Amino acid sequence: MSAPKNEMYYSLLEWFKTLNLNAPHADAESLADGVALAQALNQFAPESFTDAWLSKIKASAVGSNWRLRMSNLKKVTQSVYDYYSDVLNYSLSDFSKPDLQRIAEKCDLGELERLLQLVLGCAVNCAEKQSYITEIMCLEEELQANIMRALQELEATRQASTPEGGVASSLSRGSRTGLLDSKAVQEDRDALAQKCFETEKKMLLLIDEKTNLQQELHKLQQEFARLEQHSTVIGDDGVSLGPVQTGSVRYNELRRQLDLLKEELLQSEGAREDLKIKAQQQDTDLLHMQMRIEELMKSSAEVTTLKDEVDVLRESNDKLKICEAQLDTYKKKLEDYNDLKKQVKILEERSADYVQQNAQFEEDAKRYANTKGQVELFKKEIQDLHAKLDAESSKNVKLEFDNKNLESKNLALQRAKDSLLKERDNLREAVDELKCGQLSSNTALTGTTVSRELQPSATVEKLQRLEAENKALREGQGGQTALAQLLDDANKRCENLREQLKTANERILSLSHASQSDDPILKESEFGKQIKQLMELNEQKTLQLEEAVTQSTSLQCKVTQLETNLSAREQEILVYDAKYRKCVEKAKEVIKSIDPRIASALDASVLEKSADLVEEEPKPKMSVMEEQLMTSAFYRLGVNAQRDAIDSKLAILMGSGQTFLARQRQSAPRKSLSAMKSK
């Protein structure tokens, strides 16, 4: 797996950005001076990277001076290598050391990647490594994979074991718990394959070395045998060394060479044993690696199967949600259907009540039609009586006014009489007495006539009788037109009473002015009586006016109530007509579905009946509905009878050419018309 260019650097930079540092560390230029790296190392391991060491890093006045950057980076890298070798017991001999000059001069991303890789190893091997590992696991999956690969490359160069068992193993354990996905497993498998390849290469090199050593040993043995066979040997200077005897120079020289060769042989055998042990260890490691690869393959297969199962469960969960939503909608529809059933029952009960009410209303209308004539006669009589009452009241007012004028004249004559009585002599007493008698008789006659005219007992009784009759008519009358006419009459009466009240007030004012213009001492008592009488009449008329107003308001309320009831009943009748039409249309559709010929005949009959209904007088709605229901029932009965006849004929035809048992096995025909009629 070859990663894209500088992908690991950007992943390490994203991890480095998560650290809380004072120095800027967002890009390559800010990391090239080594200040941010030194602060990070001080944060990871303050016991190794002390504050005194951090003070040696020149943070200020670095700028673009690459030599100062170079010195800072040298201090950082040297301290990091010392930390790996002394504290972590790591050998970084196989790890390529970053080129600090390229980092200082050009901010090379590849070299910065290796330097950040070393800093990452310090972070995940410090005392607080668990917190940094959890921070790495909080990153995105791609970043985690790249960081894991960087740690594995760093782990591959390790030469000595640590008590913790390695950073990659600890991080792999964490990744098993937190990053169990196919991508991480694939990367682990690639890393293990790389390790296996490297171990195989090392094993081949060791085998080559072993063969070379065996060849050299064989050559030495051959040379030793050759030297033992020859008695005389010529040395390097061309001088014969003599025979090989104990104690001779040649013997000693050969003994020394033999000892050296034995030591070399022992060393080569020890190296061979070491190589064997290493080869065995590498074979065991290879087997472990292969087993681990197989386990990882199994885990990846399990992961894929689990993913497939998760996808299946998701699909089933989505289907379950859809089914639950459909179930909720069906429940709501069922509840609505039950509510509609209840409403239909209520409407059927109401329709039955309305049919009864309509029948009662038709009976009431028939009864009220007979009383309309009587009401009109009573209205005419009431109007005539009101006109007579108005004429008599106007006459009464005129007579009262004339009576008052006569009384004023009478008082004036009495005063004149009293003055004349004092001046007359005793001789004219008889004449005066006769005259006074005549005057008294005239006044008595006029007083009796006036009193008779002023007595309102007959008119009052007549008025009371008319009002009682009017009330009785109002209580017995139920029609709207009669109430409206009574209301108009009452309004007219109120207007007449108001006009009479105005005239009475005008008379009172005129009389009060007249009383003020005459002698107040003599006329005070008489005018007071007249004023009291007029006030009493005024109060009576105001009471009558108030009663008439209350009656008119009550009549208006009744009229409004009757209008509202009438409008409501008209609306109900319209609703029932619409329902009836819908029912008739449905019946037509049903009949058409049964037999179109009967439907056409039914349409023709309905058209004829509609024409007859138009020509004839309008019938009541209930009778029309009954006729229509009877026709629909008759046609339905005819359809059923025709169907039964056809079924019986078919049964006869099918059973004619069969045996008795075969006819018994045939399905029985439908019920006959007589059975239906009996039901």
UniProtKB/Swiss-Prot annotation:
It comes from Drosophila melanogaster (Fruit fly). GO terms for cellular component: centrosome; cytoplasm; endosome; microtubule; synapse. Residues 1-155 are annotated as: Interaction with microtubules. SUPFAM superfamilies: Hook domain (SSF116907). The gene is hook. InterPro entries: CH_dom (IPR001715), CH_dom_sf (IPR036872), Hook_C (IPR008636), HOOK_N (IPR043936). The coiled coil domain mediates homodimerization. Residues 135-437, 480-574 form a coiled coil. Keywords: Coiled coil, Cytoplasm, Cytoskeleton, Developmental protein, Endocytosis, Endosome, Microtubule, Synapse. This is Protein hook. Transmembrane segments: none annotated. Gene3D superfamilies: Calponin-like domain. It is found in: Cytoplasm, Cytoskeleton; Endosome; Synapse. Its main location: cytoplasm.
